[in-house]
């Protein structure tokens, strides 16, 4: 990596040439932008939820029926977790952990760079369900293209949702662990 530009199959000569050309900024790959996502039906579910055409309990039932579980190791049911959050007094904040540190794991990066609005709509649906006033998206430092892309696309979102804050990880696997992540935010 030169600056924040990945150099695939890097040789000493290629790294030196990249630096000499001043190519240090991350390359953002082609992705589904806001306009395309909306034209293909994106944000419809969020709009229906916010307008009251779909209730929070409807979404929670879908989560329960799907048996969707967290991937943090315990496999905790997502619907049950969201209900537990709703049972706590506000104000509520939400943290989205994009600091995947497991060797060879790049699923978060893939969605953040290719289908960013699917990620954002899911985030905003979750925030709406649990009545979160603020959302903190925690991304690993090794994802410079995602760190550059997300604020650009977040700025395109219509007003009316929770405040979205970006936080850059400290670059160590332990930062993705829940309590360390909260301390870092």
What are these regions (language model features)?
Residues 1-185:
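Feature of Fe-S/electron-transfer and energy-metabolism proteins
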